[in-house]
Structure formats: C-alpha cells, structure tokens
C-alpha cells in the first residue's frame, strides 16, 4: 500500500475518536439503554430478480431503529440465504445483542467487536446494528456519515445498474430504462450467456460488467467465456466459478484478458490473504462482511495486496444503500442500485442522479422514514 493510501484509510479510523476528543465531554455522557426495535419488511421487486441460482419477486429484510434522546438511528439487514441467514434468524440474533447495546455506544468499535463475537454468521444483522449505531452517533454530532469517516463525497464512483437474467427482449428493455447509467452490470452464468451479451450489445454500446454468481463450473469454460466477453466490451467479470475452486482461480488469473473480481469467495478482511492470488479485485458488501467498520478494514487490506476494490449491495432499501455510499469514496467501482430495484422503499432522502448516488450534508445516513410512527 502506498503511504498516501495508508494515511487516507488510517484517517477513516481516526476521525471518530478525534471528534470525540475535541467535543464537550458532556456530549458523550451515557447513562441509559437505547430503545431498540426491529421488524421484518417485505421488499417488492419492480421486476422478477433472477441470478444463476434462483428467482425472487420479494425479499424479506429487517429494519432496525435505535432511539435515545429523541434521536433515531436506522439500520437494515438484507439476509443472505447462501450463508444460512434469514429475517427470523436475524431477529433472534438481535435479541442476543440487546445487552451489548445497553453499554456506551460511543465506544462503537468495542460494541461491534462484542456483537461480532456472539456468532460466526449473521453478518447482515450485524451490519444493521453497526449502521444504526453510527447513524445515531452522527446525528448526535450533527455530521453526515461520510464526514465522520473522514471521506470526500466528491470521490464517489458512478454506480452500475444491474440487469437480472431474463428473456433477452426483457433484458433489452431494462437496458433502455437504464439510460441515465454510464455503466451496466449484466447477470450471467447460464447456458445462454453469449446470446445475452449479444442481445445487450444490439441496444447499447455502454461499458458492461458481468456477474456469473459462480455459474460456470469448469475453468476452461470460464476462460473461454471471459476472453470472449473481453472482446464484447466487458470491463471485468465477478465470481465466474464456485468459491471453493481457488486453485482454478489461480490458473484462470494468469490467462484472462480482463480482471476477475471475487464476491462469494470472501466475506471479511481476514479472508483476503488466502484468495488474493486468484483474483484481481474484491467486491465488498456491508451485508456480507458485517457492516461499515469491517468494510473500511477490507478496503485497506485489499489495497495492501494491490487489489482493485468494488463496493456492492444486496436488494436493499435506501438505508442500506446510503450506508454503503458513505464508504464508497474508498473504492474503485460501485454497484449500489439495490434500492432502485424495489417498488416500496420505506426511506426517503437518497437520490441517484446520472448514475451516481448523491450524498447530502444531512446528519447520519441522510435518510428518513415513516415506517415508525412514534
């Protein structure tokens, strides 16, 4: 990692503690528990969402609110079934975490470590608690989250809009609807991938990125498809093969014409050293790694291994996307469109304009909701 990059990432970790040292001591007095509420919320997708491993019309997320002194901090969990998570398991984990949240949340790093140690998994609900705590702290300080992290909102990369697997005419129509986005992400990993990309190319000449979601099972197949896609204007491919095929990824890395980005092959910063030799970059997701703090650590470790960094998302509301967007000045590529895929976003205040998520100077995440009426 270059000295400049190290200092930038170090600044992210130092920013919160410096603010605490500089502010009036009484601001940080902690003498009572938070009110904590979490509820399942069904997200209705605008279009059926199909990947190489399934189709969904509805996703069940968990919305979290912590409240104290008239200030609400919001968080969101988008459970990942691949890792054994569900909305119900997230609620059960949150009950285990309640005693930790009765402690001083100004010591938010300690609280996150204690929450993380409660169980190996449940990263999505850990992310919800992490973002809710930081949203509350930032609102108390009257600071937007990106400034609390020491990051410049002017460095946010453009986000892709994802096109799920569908009949080619429907995918072409989704491309037309994405006219404001400079780069598109196309889901692949099927027997019809060539026809899909050729069909997309009939209606746009924009740069493309593809995501196979582990859909290609042989390295020779992956190599052939990736190098063919390179000639079709595809910039990089995410997770072409199953995560367990690490030696095949090492073989593939030396032979492909465009970068291969790891997604399902890793979850947290500790996973990066073991997979770095097989990839050109990584995809960080708050729901996969456990929250904002771990995402920042992952970006730092990835840079140390000279890897490109992408920030992705699940199907989420504007709360989850706002949290990820605050971290996005640290990364090279962004795929933060989860809120644009749903028809019933309960949060307001976040905009995506000409393919960029717009961070405001409102405190915390910068989003509001009428989901809680009190």
Q: Which residues make up each language-model segment?
A:
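N-terminal export signals
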Residues: 3-25
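Flexible C-terminal active-site loop/helix
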Residues: 8-11, 28-45, 61, 69, ...
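Metal- or metallocofactor-binding catalytic centers and their adjacent structured scaffolds
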Residues: 30-38, 54, 67, 72-140
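Short Pro/Gly-enriched beta-strand edge/turn motifs at strand-loop
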Residues: 42-50, 233
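Conserved, mostly hydrophobic/aromatic
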Residues: 64, 70, 129, 142, ...
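Metal-dependent enolase-superfamily TIM-barrel catalytic cores that perform enediolate-based chemistry
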Residues: 145-256
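Structural recognition of alpha->loop->beta junctions
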Residues: 225-237, 276-282, 326-347
């Amino acid at each position: 990692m270059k000295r400049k990059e190290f200092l930038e990432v170090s600044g992210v970790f130092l920013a919160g503690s410096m603010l605490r040292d500089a502010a009036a001591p009484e601001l940080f007095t902690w003498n009572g528990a938070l009110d904590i509420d979490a509820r399942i919320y069904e997200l209705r997708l605008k279009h059926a969402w199909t990947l190489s491993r399934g189709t969904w019309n509805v996703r069940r997320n968990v919305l979290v609110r912590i409240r104290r002194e008239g200030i609400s901090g919001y968080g969101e969990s988008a459970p990942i079934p691949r890792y054994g998570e569900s909305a119900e398991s997230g609620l059960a984990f949150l009950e285990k975490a309640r005693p930790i949240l009765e402690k001083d949340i100004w010591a938010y790093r300690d609280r996150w470590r204690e929450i993380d140690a409660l169980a190996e998994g449940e990263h999505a609900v850990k992310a919800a608690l992490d973002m809710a705590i930081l949203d509350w702290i930032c609102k108390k300080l009257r600071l937007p989250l990106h400034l609390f992290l020491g990051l410049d909102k002017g460095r946010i990369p453009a986000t892709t809009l994802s096109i799920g697997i569908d009949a080619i005419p429907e995918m072409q129509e989704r491309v037309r609807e994405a006219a404001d986005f400079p780069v598109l992400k196309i889901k692949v990993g099927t027997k019809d991938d060539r026809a899909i990309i050729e069909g997309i190319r009939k209606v746009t000449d924009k740069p493309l990125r593809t995501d196979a979601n582990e859909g290609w099972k042989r390295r020779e197949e992956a190599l052939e498809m990736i190098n063919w896609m390179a000639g079709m204007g595809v910039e990089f491919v995410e997770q072409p093969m199953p995560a367990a095929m690490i030696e095949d990824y090492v073989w593939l890395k030396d032979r492909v014409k465009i970068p291969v980005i790891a997604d399902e092959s890793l979850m947290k910063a500790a996973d990066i050293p073991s997979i770095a030799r097989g990839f050109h970059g990584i995809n960080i997701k708050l729901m996969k790694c456990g929250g904002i703090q771990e995402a920042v650590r992952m970006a730092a470790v990835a840079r140390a291994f000279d890897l490109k960094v992408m920030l992705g998302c699940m199907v989420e509301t504007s709360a989850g996307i706002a949290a990820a967007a605050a971290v996005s000045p640290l990364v090279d590529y962004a795929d933060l469109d989860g809120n644009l895929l749903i028809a019933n976003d309960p949060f307001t205040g976040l905009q995506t304009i000409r393919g960029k998520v717009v961070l405001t100077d409102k405190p915390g995440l910068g989003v509001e909701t009428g989901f809680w009426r009190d």
